Amino acid sequence: MRLTRRAFVQAAAAPLLAPPQQAPPAQAALTVAHLVDRIRAAVGPWREKTVDGIKAGDPSVALTGVAVTVAARLENLRRAASAGCNLVITQEPVFYGANDDPGNRASDAVYLAKKAYIDQAKLVLWRFSDHWSTRQPDPRVAAIAEALSWQDGPGSDNIYRIPETSLSSLMAHVSTRLGLRGGMRTVGPPGMRVRTVLVSPGTTDLATTVARLKGADVVLAGEPREWEVVPYVLDARESGAAKALISIGRIVSEEPGMHACAAWIRTLAPGLRVEALPVSDPFWNAAS
C-alpha cells in the first residue's frame, strides 16, 4: 500500500503532538529518623525506660551514612564525618554520664568542645545499648566467641567449651585476638587447666557470676564489679573449686558486638554506607 504525503506527515508528527509522559515521582530521601524507626521495629518492643535514643543533632535530616562504634569519642566523630557519615550509633554514652545528662559538665571545656564539634559537623548521635545488648542470643557474646574462634556453644548460659588449655595460654590467646594493650587482669593460677569459659561482656555483676560460674572454669568478663565478683571467685577457690576470672575491660569486651551491629544494620538498609569504627583498648601498661 502506497503511503500518501499527508499520511506520512501525520505519522511523523504524532510523537510530537502526544501528551508528555509524566516522570515517576522522586523517591523521598532516607532520613536518620527513618533508619532509627527501622531499627526499633526490628528489635521488637521498645522499653519505656532506656538509655537508648537521640543524644545530639536533628534526626529529620537526610541520612548520608552511618558510623557504628562502641564509644563515640571525639576522634571517632571526626572519622565519621570524614567518611561522609552523619549518623553515629554508639554503645556507650556520648557525654560521659550514664544517661548523657551533662549535669555539672554543662560548662566544662571538654564537654563544650565535643558538643561544638557535633554541631559544626552536623552529626546526629544515637545511643543503641539496652536494646542491642538484650537481644537473644546475645550478639555481643557471639561476636567475642567468633573473634576467639570458639565454636562449641553457647547454651542459654553463654558458656563455651574450648580445647583444654592453661589459664596463661588462654590469656595470651584472648590478648592477641582482641588486641589488648594493657587492660587485662586475672584471678587464678597461670597453670590452671581450662575447658569451659563463661563469656560476660560489659558489666559483670555478682548475680550473673553466682548463677553461671558453676558450669564454667573461667569468667571472661568485661568490667566485673571488683568488690563483688573478685572476692566471690577467690572464696570459691579457697573452698576448693577451680575457678578463675579474666577481666579484659568494658570497651574491649563490647567492641566485637558493635562490629556485628554494623553488619546487622546493613541488612536493614541495603546500599547505605555503614562503617564500623574501631576504638580498641584505651589502656596500656609498661610491658605492652
Where are these regions (language model features)?
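Hydrophobic structural segments
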Residues: 2-288
